[in-house]
Regions:
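Short secondary-structure boundary/capping segments
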Residues: 98-103, 224-226, 263-270, 352-355, ...
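Short acidic, S/G/P-rich loop/turn micro-motifs used as interaction or catalytic elements
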Residues: 63, 213-222, 256-259, 435-438, ...
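Flexible secondary-structure boundary motifs
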Residues: 21-41, 176-177, 297-317, 443-446
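P-loop NTPase nucleotide-binding core
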Residues: 53, 58-207, 216, 455-460
Length: 529
């Protein structure tokens, strides 16, 4: 009986579900494209039994949740360690905004680091005291000290408490900066850490897993960045502490967080850390991912089953580009319209498979140009719309007035669909004024000036577009036919480089914004292999 839902999933989503947070883990594992033997894959080649990983970094849709679920499942199968369930219920954005406005830029990251430290300690303590399997390992004196001596700092818990719940509890209990600082820096925390260390030495190694950052991050990116940066720094500090020998916390953070850390004065210590895994897909790894997804398709989704790869799937290897007067390889055409992430490839693959099934029923052996372009355009429009809305949310959250997190006015900027929708339409209108998908330095300066004017003094619309992968620049290498978009490890990653001759919009943007294609060379954010 359990096989029926799987057959329905296979028919409706031949490439699999796009969201790794949902679905049966075994199905996710079965559909996982393993890159552990792919030598050029970097963090993507991480094995599920690798216990050295502490931070998974990447954009939305790169697979952070799938990797974290695999790490957690592997650890939970090991009898000698305790692996908590994956946490997926972050604190409210309103709480994150409030902390960002209670403290200035010089102290907010340090404050977040302390919040995460106390929340992790409280969560670990609740696990040790509330789970009989762990509690039985503790000396009676240690258990009594933890349970009785710190009720002023840590409310009694009857069940194991997730880290996220402890963060929300800490933030919900105080509404003034000095009160929060007093709580976080109370002298009794040192005593609690001492007894917690003794408890952890007797108990099995403990692994905690913190996920679900993407959906909340995009509501107020710069505020969540500071929150996650504090989490990142605390995880790396914990790794070097005595507690970190027995307490292991594995987290997911956004690429912008790593970019911010690497730009700090201590960035070099993290650049090649074996405990940080950057899930950064390039054209080779995402091409391999696409090829594997095609290889696993059944004959029902292959227009020419006797052939392999793109040709077997869609019945063709090239497609005309009438706007530029060139022919493109189909694989190149498909991938350049994505953000080079698995989620986009899965979305696009499922949409194309639906058309393949219809064409097979009609007896066709290849997908016509116009049909292929229409499907790609429809899916790319969705990608562009999502990212434009993320840009609009970032602009809106940057406009939250001082103290907005305390007086409730922040909801107008980050909780109002009407306001964010208006910002998104304004971004579209600004992009339309560029006229084309390729333009010069003067057009970028004009875009920045118009953004400043229309968004009430907002200074950084070009940087917001750059950080979200919508705006890039053509390579200045001789005879190059590729563009550069944001990379978290780039030295200038937070700001659009101002010294380039030619700038471009991502290929999905013209499917959402009325723009003409400029030049014969299609925009692609990678160097073709």
């Amino acid at each position: 009986m359990p096989a029926a839902p799987r057959r329905r999933l296979a028919f409706h989503a031949p490439f699999g579900p796009p969201d790794g947070a949902t679905g049966n883990l075994q199905e996710v594992q079965d559909r996982f494209v393993d890159l552990s033997r792919y030598t050029a894959a970097g963090g993507l080649a991480s094995r599920p039994d690798d216990r050295t990983v502490r931070v998974l970094v990447g954009r939305k849709g790169v697979g952070k949740t799938i990797y974290l679920r695999r790490f957690q499942a592997s650890a939970s199968d090991e009898d000698s360690v305790f692996a908590a369930d994956r946490e997926a219920d972050p604190p409210a954005t309103e709480d994150v905004l409030r902390v960002g406005q209670l403290f200035d830029n010089k102290t907010v990251t340090e404050t977040w680091q302390l919040i995460w430290r106390r929340a992790i300690q409280r969560s670990a303590m609740s696990q040790l005291l509330c789970l009989p399997w762990l509690r039985d390992h503790l000396e009676p004196e240690v258990a009594d000290r933890l349970r009785l001596d710190f009720t002023g700092l840590v409310p009694a818990a009857r069940t194991p408490r997730p880290v996220y719940a402890e963060v929300s509890d800490i933030l919900g209990g105080v509404h003034a900066a000095h009160r929060l600082s007093e709580h976080l820096k109370h002298r009794d925390w040192a005593d609690l850490e001492y007894w917690l260390g003794k408890a952890l030495r007797d108990a099995p190694p403990m692994y905690l897993y913190i996920d679900a950052v993407d959906d909340h991050f995009q509501r107020a990116p710069m505020y969540w960045l500071k929150c996650q940066k504090g989490l990142f720094l605390e995880i790396m500090r914990l790794l070097q502490s005595d507690l970190g020998r027995r307490l292991h916390v594995v987290v997911c953070v956004r690429d912008l967080v790593l970019s911010s850390v690497l730009r700090s004065e201590h960035g070099s210590r993290y650049r090649r850390s074996p405990h940080i895994r950057l899930l950064e897909w390039d054209i080779r790894s995402i091409g391999y991912f696409l090829a594997e997804k095609i290889r696993r398709l059944g004959a029902a989704f292959m227009l020419q089953p006797s052939k392999s790869g793109i040709e077997g799937w869609l019945g063709r290897t090239t497609i005309g580009n009438p706007a530029r007067g060139v022919e493109e390889h189909v694989e190149d055409y498909l991938l350049r319209h994505t953000r080079l992430i698995p989620r986009d490839v899965v979305d696009l693959g499922n949409a194309l498979c639906e058309q393949v099934a219809e064409l097979k029923a009609e007896g066709a052996r290849s997908m016509p140009d116009d049909r292929l372009r229409r499907v790609v355009g429809d899916v790319a429009r969705g990608f562009a719309d999502e990212q434009i809305r993320v840009c609009a949310n970032q602009i809106a959250s940057d406009q939250v007035p001082a103290l907005g997190g305390r007086d409730g006015s922040a909801d107008y900027f980050v909780g109002s669909h009407e306001y964010s929708d208006g910002c998104a339409e304004e971004v579209v209108a600004l992009l339309e004024e560029l006229g084309g998908d390729r333009f010069g330095r003067d057009a970028v300066e004009r875009l920045a000036d118009l953004g400043h004017e229309r968004f009430g003094g907002h200074q950084h619309i070009v940087d917001v577009l750059w950080q979200n992968g919508r705006l890039g620049h053509d390579s200045m290498e001789p005879r190059a036919e590729h563009a550069h978009f944001y990379s978290p490890t780039g030295a200038d990653s937070f700001h659009l480089p101002a010294d380039k001759d030619s700038y471009v919009l991502h290929p999905c943007v013209p499917h959402r914004v009325r723009l003409r294609h400029v030049g014969r060379v299609p925009v692609r954010g990678y160097r073709r292999p």
